[in-house]
């Protein structure tokens, strides 16, 4: 059952079509959001919000022979500065287009609206400060009781000028990072080198502890190795096996090689007289060796 309900019916919240001046620095595009009254209603209902769809209508106001590229960026200010970009569009300055971006995240109504639209122009023969286009942004929001997984839908560009084609435009959207499991670290107050707290190994019938253990692996999966090993599949599997399971072949060794010898309870205990005899013999050997080396020096 879909828990989303439209905030403003099924209509888009539209900003006024506004003229923008050409600049080489990123400048904001006006994006209209719900009124304070509407946001208060959603807050009272205890719901969160989601940006369903953003449409940016670009209409140029430049001469026939104008050159340059317009770059429109959509950002989410909740992330760190270097990772805020969510999508980016590029198109010729003389091309009329509609840019479509479909959201992939929710946000709290108690926070400031995290979305920003920015534009800039590069490699243009149009002077800075000249009004070069009209831009209108339309926004569609929805409210939900709680967040759910959102199916990714790629952004699109609708070209309205006949003199331009798909090879004149480009767009990009951010990818989802690969999930990495982070192992639990040592308890507070313990040394890092003492090793992690491993869970007991479950040995099933027909298995050995050596084949199931992973002694020798890194104590943390926080970082991935920057080096790539260029070997074939068979060698790669063997390498990974030896690295992750260094004791896999321990059970195949003969029992004699694994026998540490008699235990303390099985060996004959030494008396004080035996220990004194060993010390006396050792001292005598050291004295004899020292005297021999002294004669050689003379």
Curated annotation (Swiss-Prot):
The keyword NAD does not apply. One of its GO terms (cellular component) is membrane. One of its GO terms (biological process) is transport of virus in host, cell to cell. Transports viral genome to neighboring plant cells directly through plasmosdesmata, without any budding. The movement protein allows efficient cell to cell propagation, by bypassing the host cell wall barrier. Begomovirus genome is shuttled out of nucleus by Nuclear shuttle protein (NSP) and the movement protein transports the DNA-NSP complex to cell plasmodesmata and facilitates further movement across the cell wall. It comes from the Viruses. This is Movement protein BC1. GO terms for molecular function: DNA binding. Belongs to the begomovirus movement protein BC1 family. Disulfide bonds: none annotated. Binds to dimeric supercoiled plasmid DNA. Its main location: host cell. Residues 253-273 are annotated as: Disordered. InterPro entries: Gemini_BL.
């Amino acid at each position: 059952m879909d828990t989303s309900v439209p905030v403003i019916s099924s209509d888009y919240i539209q900003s006024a079509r506004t003229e923008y001046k050409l600049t080489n620095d990123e400048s904001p595009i006006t994006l209209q959001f719900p009124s304070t009254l509407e946001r208060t209603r959603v807050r009272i209902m205890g719901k969160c919000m989601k940006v369903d769809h953003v449409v940016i209508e670009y209409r140029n106001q430049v001469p026939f022979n104008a050159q340059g590229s317009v770059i429109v960026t959509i950002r989410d200010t909740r992330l760190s500065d270097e990772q805020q970009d969510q999508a980016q569009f590029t198109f010729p300055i003389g091309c009329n287009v509609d840019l479509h971006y479909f959201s992939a995240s929710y946000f709290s109504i108690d926070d400031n609206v995290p979305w920003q639209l920015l534009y800039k122009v590069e490699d243009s023969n149009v002077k800075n400060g000249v009004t070069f286009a009209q831009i209108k942004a339309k926004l569609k929001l929805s409210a939900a009781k709680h967040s759910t997984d959102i199916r990714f839908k790629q952004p699109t560009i609708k070209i309205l000028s006949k003199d331009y084609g798909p090879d004149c435009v480009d767009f990009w959207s951010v990818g989802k990072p690969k999930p990495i499991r982070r192992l639990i670290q040592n308890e507070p107050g313990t040394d890092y080198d003492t090793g992690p707290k491993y869970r007991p190994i479950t040995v099933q019938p027909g298995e050995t502890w050596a084949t199931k253990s992973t002694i020798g692996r890194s104590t943390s999966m926080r970082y991935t190795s920057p080096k790539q090993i260029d070997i074939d599949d068979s060698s790669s599997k063997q390498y990974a096996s030896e690295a992750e399971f260094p004791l896999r072949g321990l059970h195949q060794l003969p029992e004699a090689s694994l026998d540490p010898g008699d235990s303390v309870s099985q060996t004959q205990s030494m008396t004080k007289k035996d220990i004194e005899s060993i010390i006396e013999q050792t001292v005598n050997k050291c004295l004899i060796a020292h005297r021999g080396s002294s004669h050689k020096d003379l």
